[in-house]
């Protein structure tokens, strides 16, 4: 998934930035699924902060209306 600001301040080729996980859209199906839930190891505060700062939102860029970057300074 491309969610970065491209040329002309657009949101990427597939314009799906508003959806964090476009592959997981709700779809109607007659088949049953099994969901397995688990527990992840605890992260220390420093690890969490480093992970949060590494995302694209740290640059202040997100997809706004009409698939344009907001703000347009990426």
From Swiss-Prot:
The tissues where this chain's protein is expressed are given as: Expressed in leaves of mature plants.
Q: What induces it?
A: Under different stress conditions, such as excess heavy metals, heat shock and salt stresses.
Domain of life of the organism encoding this protein: Eukaryota
Swiss-Prot/TrEMBL keywords:
Metal-binding, Metal-thiolate cluster, Stress response
Q: Which GO terms describe its molecular function?
A: metal ion binding
One of its Pfam families is: Metallothio_2
The UniProt function text for this chain reads: Metallothioneins have a high content of cysteine residues that bind various heavy metals. May be involved in ROS homeostasis. May act as reactive oxygen species (ROS) scavenger in response to salt stress.
Q: What family does the Swiss-Prot or TrEMBL record give for this protein?
A: Belongs to the metallothionein superfamily. Type 15 family.
What is the official name of this protein in its record? Answer: Metallothionein-like protein 1A
Q: What is the lineage of its organism?
A: Eukaryota, Viridiplantae, Streptophyta, Embryophyta, Tracheophyta
The UniProt gene name for this protein comes to: MT1A
């Amino acid at each position: 998934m491309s969610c970065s600001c491209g040329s002309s301040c657009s949101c990427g080729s597939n314009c799906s930035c508003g959806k964090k996980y476009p592959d997981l859209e709700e779809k109607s199906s007659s088949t049953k699924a099994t969901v397995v839930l688990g527990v992840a190891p605890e992260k220390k505060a420093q690890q969490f902060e480093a992970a949060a700062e590494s995302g694209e939102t740290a640059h202040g860029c997100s997809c706004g209306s009409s698939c344009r970057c907001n703000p347009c300074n990426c």
